[in-house]
Protein backbone atom coordinates (compact mmCIF):
# COMPACT_ATOMS: atom_id res chain seq x y z
CA UNK A 1 0.00 0.00 0.00
CA UNK A 2 1.07 3.54 -0.71
CA UNK A 3 -0.28 6.85 0.49
CA UNK A 4 0.38 10.21 -1.11
CA UNK A 5 -0.61 13.63 0.14
CA UNK A 6 0.36 17.25 -0.12
CA UNK A 7 3.38 18.10 2.06
CA UNK A 8 1.38 21.02 3.50
CA UNK A 9 -1.60 18.89 4.57
CA UNK A 10 -2.67 19.32 8.20
CA UNK A 11 -4.93 17.09 10.28
CA UNK A 12 -7.59 19.17 12.03
CA UNK A 13 -9.46 17.98 15.12
CA UNK A 14 -11.10 19.12 18.33
CA UNK A 15 -8.75 19.10 21.32
CA UNK A 16 -10.81 19.87 24.41
CA UNK A 17 -8.62 21.38 27.11
CA UNK A 18 -5.73 22.55 24.92
CA UNK A 19 -4.29 26.00 25.39
CA UNK A 20 -4.64 28.66 22.72
CA UNK A 21 -2.54 31.82 22.68
CA UNK A 22 -3.43 35.00 20.80
CA UNK A 23 -5.20 33.43 17.80
CA UNK A 24 -7.64 35.33 15.60
CA UNK A 25 -10.50 32.83 15.42
CA UNK A 26 -13.18 35.36 14.32
CA UNK A 27 -13.52 33.53 11.01
CA UNK A 28 -15.25 30.73 12.93
CA UNK A 29 -16.02 32.04 16.43
CA UNK A 30 -17.41 35.47 17.32
CA UNK A 31 -19.46 37.16 20.04
CA UNK A 32 -18.50 34.80 22.85
CA UNK A 33 -20.33 35.25 26.16
CA UNK A 34 -19.02 37.95 28.49
CA UNK A 35 -17.43 39.76 25.53
CA UNK A 36 -14.46 37.34 25.32
CA UNK A 37 -12.14 38.53 22.54
CA UNK A 38 -11.93 36.24 19.50
CA UNK A 39 -9.58 38.47 17.53
CA UNK A 40 -6.84 37.76 20.09
CA UNK A 41 -8.27 34.60 21.59
CA UNK A 42 -6.36 33.02 24.46
CA UNK A 43 -7.34 30.31 26.91
CA UNK A 44 -5.73 27.57 28.96
CA UNK A 45 -8.78 25.32 28.50
CA UNK A 46 -10.34 25.50 25.02
CA UNK A 47 -13.64 23.82 24.26
CA UNK A 48 -13.97 21.38 21.38
CA UNK A 49 -15.21 24.06 19.00
CA UNK A 50 -12.73 26.79 19.98
CA UNK A 51 -9.84 24.31 19.86
CA UNK A 52 -10.87 23.11 16.39
CA UNK A 53 -11.23 26.72 15.22
CA UNK A 54 -7.75 27.48 16.56
CA UNK A 55 -6.29 24.34 14.93
CA UNK A 56 -7.81 25.35 11.60
CA UNK A 57 -6.52 28.93 11.80
CA UNK A 58 -3.06 27.72 12.88
CA UNK A 59 -2.94 25.36 9.89
CA UNK A 60 -3.90 28.19 7.54
CA UNK A 61 -1.31 30.52 9.08
CA UNK A 62 1.34 27.80 8.68
CA UNK A 63 0.60 27.69 4.95
CA UNK A 64 -1.47 24.52 4.75
CA UNK A 65 -3.18 23.97 1.41
CA UNK A 66 -5.09 20.87 2.54
CA UNK A 67 -7.15 20.30 5.69
CA UNK A 68 -7.74 16.68 6.71
CA UNK A 69 -10.82 16.33 8.94
CA UNK A 70 -12.47 13.26 10.41
CA UNK A 71 -16.04 13.74 11.57
CA UNK A 72 -15.38 11.34 14.47
CA UNK A 73 -12.72 13.60 16.04
CA UNK A 74 -14.43 16.91 15.31
CA UNK A 75 -16.64 19.14 17.42
CA UNK A 76 -20.09 18.70 15.88
CA UNK A 77 -21.09 22.30 16.61
CA UNK A 78 -17.94 23.51 14.85
CA UNK A 79 -18.69 21.46 11.74
CA UNK A 80 -22.43 22.11 11.22
CA UNK A 81 -25.67 23.43 12.71
CA UNK A 82 -28.77 21.72 11.43
CA UNK A 83 -31.64 23.76 10.03
CA UNK A 84 -33.92 23.19 13.02
CA UNK A 85 -31.26 24.56 15.37
CA UNK A 86 -30.72 27.53 13.04
CA UNK A 87 -34.45 28.22 13.10
CA UNK A 88 -34.82 27.97 16.89
CA UNK A 89 -31.61 29.83 17.79
CA UNK A 90 -30.91 32.69 15.41
CA UNK A 91 -27.42 32.88 13.90
CA UNK A 92 -26.77 36.24 15.58
CA UNK A 93 -27.21 34.53 18.98
CA UNK A 94 -24.82 31.69 18.11
CA UNK A 95 -21.08 32.46 18.34
CA UNK A 96 -19.95 29.63 16.05
CA UNK A 97 -19.92 29.96 12.26
CA UNK A 98 -19.94 26.27 11.25
CA UNK A 99 -17.21 24.91 8.99
CA UNK A 100 -19.80 23.94 6.36
CA UNK A 101 -20.46 27.67 5.85
CA UNK A 102 -16.75 28.39 5.32
CA UNK A 103 -15.38 25.39 3.43
CA UNK A 104 -16.14 26.74 -0.08
CA UNK A 105 -14.90 30.20 0.89
CA UNK A 106 -11.60 28.69 2.09
CA UNK A 107 -11.15 27.09 -1.31
CA UNK A 108 -12.28 30.13 -3.31
CA UNK A 109 -10.29 32.76 -1.41
CA UNK A 110 -7.26 30.83 -0.14
CA UNK A 111 -7.07 27.78 -2.44
CA UNK A 112 -7.31 25.55 0.64
CA UNK A 113 -8.85 22.15 -0.04
CA UNK A 114 -10.53 19.93 2.54
CA UNK A 115 -10.77 16.17 2.74
CA UNK A 116 -13.54 15.29 5.16
CA UNK A 117 -14.23 11.75 6.33
CA UNK A 118 -17.90 11.64 7.28
CA UNK A 119 -20.41 8.94 7.96
CA UNK A 120 -23.40 10.71 9.47
CA UNK A 121 -23.78 14.18 7.96
CA UNK A 122 -24.93 14.22 4.35
CA UNK A 123 -25.22 18.03 4.32
CA UNK A 124 -21.58 18.17 3.24
CA UNK A 125 -22.60 16.59 -0.10
CA UNK A 126 -23.94 20.05 -1.03
CA UNK A 127 -20.50 21.64 -0.78
CA UNK A 128 -18.35 18.69 -1.90
CA UNK A 129 -16.59 18.65 -5.27
CA UNK A 130 -16.06 14.92 -5.02
CA UNK A 131 -17.64 12.20 -2.88
CA UNK A 132 -15.87 8.89 -2.37
CA UNK A 133 -17.58 6.04 -0.55
CA UNK A 134 -15.54 3.39 1.20
CA UNK A 135 -17.24 0.12 0.25
CA UNK A 136 -15.70 -2.84 2.08
CA UNK A 137 -12.49 -0.82 2.45
CA UNK A 138 -12.37 -0.01 -1.27
CA UNK A 139 -12.89 3.55 -2.58
CA UNK A 140 -15.87 4.08 -4.88
CA UNK A 141 -16.54 7.41 -6.62
CA UNK A 142 -20.22 8.39 -6.01
CA UNK A 143 -20.30 12.17 -6.58
CA UNK A 144 -23.19 12.14 -9.07
CA UNK A 145 -25.31 9.91 -6.85
CA UNK A 146 -24.58 11.99 -3.74
CA UNK A 147 -25.34 15.29 -5.51
CA UNK A 148 -28.58 13.88 -6.91
CA UNK A 149 -29.67 12.63 -3.48
CA UNK A 150 -28.72 15.96 -1.87
CA UNK A 151 -31.15 17.81 -4.17
CA UNK A 152 -34.02 16.12 -2.30
CA UNK A 153 -32.72 17.73 0.93
CA UNK A 154 -31.81 21.31 0.00
CA UNK A 155 -29.72 23.32 2.42
CA UNK A 156 -31.67 26.28 3.72
CA UNK A 157 -28.70 27.87 5.43
CA UNK A 158 -26.65 30.63 3.84
CA UNK A 159 -23.18 29.20 3.28
CA UNK A 160 -20.92 32.24 3.48
CA UNK A 161 -21.90 34.24 6.52
CA UNK A 162 -20.05 37.56 6.37
CA UNK A 163 -17.00 39.32 5.03
CA UNK A 164 -14.47 38.48 7.74
CA UNK A 165 -11.23 37.85 5.91
CA UNK A 166 -8.56 35.44 6.98
CA UNK A 167 -5.29 36.92 8.10
CA UNK A 168 -2.26 36.60 5.89
CA UNK A 169 0.11 33.75 6.50
CA UNK A 170 1.93 34.24 9.79
CA UNK A 171 5.55 33.28 10.25
CA UNK A 172 5.77 30.31 12.60
CA UNK A 173 9.06 30.05 14.46
CA UNK A 174 10.02 26.52 15.38
CA UNK A 175 12.46 25.82 18.21
CA UNK A 176 15.89 24.65 17.10
CA UNK A 177 16.83 21.10 17.97
CA UNK A 178 19.80 20.79 20.26
CA UNK A 179 22.67 18.57 19.21
Residue ranges of each PLM-predicted region?
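Phosphate-binding glycine-rich loops and their immediate beta-loop-alpha structural context
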Residues: 1-62, 66, 73-75
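Flexible, glycine/charged-enriched surface loops at secondary-structure junctions
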Residues: 2-3, 118-122
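Generic detector of bulky aromatic hydrophobic side chains
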Residues: 26-30, 110, 139, 175
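Short C-terminal domain-edge/linker segments immediately following a structured domain
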Residues: 40-46, 98-101, 145-149, 161-165
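Short, flexible loop segments at the rims of nucleotide/cofactor-binding pockets, characterized by
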Residues: 43-47, 90-93, 110-111
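Conserved P-loop NTPase nucleotide-binding/switch module
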Residues: 59-103, 107-108, 120-126, 130-145
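Conserved H-loop
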Residues: 113-116
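Conserved P-loop NTPase
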Residues: 130-179
Amino acid sequence: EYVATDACAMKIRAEDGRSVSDEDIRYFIRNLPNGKDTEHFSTLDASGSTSQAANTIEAIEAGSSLLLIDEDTSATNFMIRDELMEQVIAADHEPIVPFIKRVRQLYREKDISTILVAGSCGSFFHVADQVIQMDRYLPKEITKEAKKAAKAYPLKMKLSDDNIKLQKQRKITLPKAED
